[in-house]
Amino acid sequence: DYNDTVSLVQLAANKYTSIKVKKARGINKKIIIKGSVGFQPNILMSVEDGFRGTIILENVSLAGERGIPCIDIGKKCNVNLQIAGENELRTGGIRVPDSSVLTVVGDGNLTINLNSGKYFGIGNSLDEYHGELNFYQDGGIIINANGMKGIGIGSGLGGFINIKRGHYEFDMKGQEGACIGSVNGDSELLIEYCDM
């Protein structure tokens, strides 16, 4: 395994505004992103097409331009997202294209705040399908949304969602939307052993 640790405090001090997670050929990569409770930099994260491995968020706060995903996963990725401590995505969610897999684990909490006309929390936009979404975490996922139309976990056109554990809270204000599933398409949902 190949491990990297990234400090948000150091990145912000050096005026970086993005983290680009690169794939490593032939090996599973592990990236640790470390923040600090209360520290809120304007930094976004993108994951290169074809990445396979684990990304650990430890007391991380990410934000950027409103309406752009705070974590943008590329095509044909298999990402194990481990949540530790208190984490927040302040201006956008996690984009998972239909060719990728996201598995959420860990005992930390993740809060996603969305404030845009059209929005999604974890999944993909209203005119796209999302990839496979697996939730095996023990911690909480809290999604707060203000907008005209959107989705908490899922996408506009649908996909596969497997929720096996965890605590979930949704506070979604707007004209049209869904907490879990799809807005305009079909979703395959498996939900058990969780608290909503």
Positions of predicted regions on the chain:
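A composition-driven surface/loop motif
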Residues: 1-196
